[in-house]
Amino acid sequence: MGSGKSSIGKILAKRTSKKFLDIDFQIIKNQGMNISEIFEKYGEEYFRNLEKKELEKLDNIEDYIISTGGGIILKQENIDMMKKIGLILFLDIDINAQLERVKNKKNRPLIDNDNVESSLLALKKYRDPIYNNICDYIIDVSNKEKNVIIKEIEKIIL
């Protein structure tokens, strides 16, 4: 959350002549409501199943840069599918940089707007070990310009 997955993915896809696919955007488009509304109306488990369905559509996909929501790794089936599809890059961000990026955004369903830092710390504590275990590469995006991050990723994927 707040690591720049979507914005970096779009730029990277353009620079590498690959197509870009944002799983969250596909879900929003298909459901006709934003992620916060989906969480509120149907719950997190429903949303995680939507992520799984979107990944299942990508079984034989090539030449794509794919951005996922940060919680996609909470289902083992999603991890297995992502590993089958291609490389998993973890855009890691330190808590201070993350807080700066998301503190004024009120549409994050897993963030308590009255206690943003505690919410982020809890998510990070739970998710980061999973990412560290499953990813092929970790890219620290804390306090870096997008062009620097993209060059780091290009060295890996090209």
Feature names for model-found ranges:
Residues 3:
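ATP-binding Walker
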Residues 16, 84-85, 106, 134-135:
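Short, structured coil segments at secondary-structure junctions
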Residues 21, 87-89, 137-139:
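Hydrophobic/aromatic beta-strand patches that form the interior of the parallel beta-sheet core
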Residues 6:
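Walker A/P-loop
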Residues 11, 15, 61, 125-158:
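NTP-dependent small-molecule kinase module
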Residues 46-87, 142:
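Glycine-rich phosphate-binding loop used to anchor ATP phosphates in small-molecule kinases
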Residues 14-53:
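Conserved substrate/cofactor phosphate-moiety recognition/catalytic segment
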Residues 85-128:
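A glycine- and Lys/Arg-enriched "phosphate-lid" helix/loop adjacent to the NTP-binding pocket
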